[in-house]
Amino acid sequence: VLCGAIPVYVNPEVDQRLGISLGMQREQVAKAIKEHPKAVAVLVNNPTYYGICSDLRAIVKMAHEAGMMCLVDEAHGTHFYFGGGLPVSAMEAGADMASVSMHKSGGSLTQSSLLLTGPDVHAGYVRQIINLTQTTSGSYLLMSSLDISRRNLAQRGRQIFHQVADMAEYAREEINAIGGYYAFGKELVNGNSVFDFDITKLSVHTLDIGLAGIEVYDILRDEYDIQIEFGDIGNILAYLSIGDRAQEVERLVSALAEIRRRFQTDGSGLLSQEYIDPQVVTSPQEAFYADKCSLPLRETEGKVCSEFVMCYPPGIPILAPGERITAEILDYIEYAKAKGCNMTGPEDPDILRLNVLTGRE
């Protein structure tokens, strides 16, 4: 929206059972690069919230051979720099820049992150650009937490994340033994759209017990005082990191077993698909600043959206400015709202109305 870039989406493969998007397929990235030779960069989200990793080395190589930069959203990959047996980190793969959310798995305070730059990126120029979009009066509290966390990981990171990985693997085995749940892991790896998997991520598919992920999330919080990372349409994610202990994992496993016994249903009426291919009509910047009007949600079908709509977490847009609103998207929004998902982005916080472009179909 701010810079006027026009995105070219490389739609990921979708796991039909889990209903989640996977990584970027090499051939699809190569196709997009070939069809858009004037593009300046390839942006990769690696790993995904669920722990899915793309073939980052290959994607970086393709981007560089085409004269493009490779930028990596590595928000959930802080620990890749410190753990043996974990997927390759963005910098190790040769990426030009990577944003790393230290507060997610590194132990720093919420909102604190690092922007890593490669040898071909001018750090001074990057700093100038950052100063255009954020405060020049940085929080020393946040910066101190970053430095303390960095020191802790530099000294003990490998040991810490080895323990985290062991806890996650143990939890997967125990949860899968309950029946009805599927805590997925490295068995998803196929060498392409799932090139690797972050074994510290404890993602659990819940639809086979007849409950949406967000419903299990709510039950864990309200009935068992267990706060996990998030629940979506068909899965939950328990984010294990440096502050977790084995007894907390045991509590989670026991609670999931009891939830299955107490709340299992036949699952009728549940949606399973999490990702909907976007239909881009115009650039995000043009759509965001264009003339617009507000319409009741169901009257927006076929119109071009001028705002973001997303479930948060994980914060992946269901709609972005410039994308066409379809019946499938509207069904998804209404279903997610009914199940209790936290929806953000639109001007109307209740999402009873959406802003759409005037005069554009």
Model-identified regions with their sequence ranges:
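Structural signature of PLP-dependent enzymes
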Residues: 149-172, 248
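Substrate-binding/gating loop at the entrance of the active-site cleft, primarily
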Residues: 1-7
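Active-site phosphate-binding strand-loop segment of PLP-dependent enzymes
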Residues: 18-79
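A short helix->loop->beta-strand "cap" motif at the edges of active sites that frequently abuts
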Residues: 5, 65-68, 95
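Active-site PLP attachment segment
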Residues: 89-128, 134-145
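Hydrophobic beta-strand scaffold residues
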Residues: 7, 70-71, 228
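Conserved C-terminal alpha-helix-loop-beta "cap" of PLP-dependent enzymes
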Residues: 170, 176-345
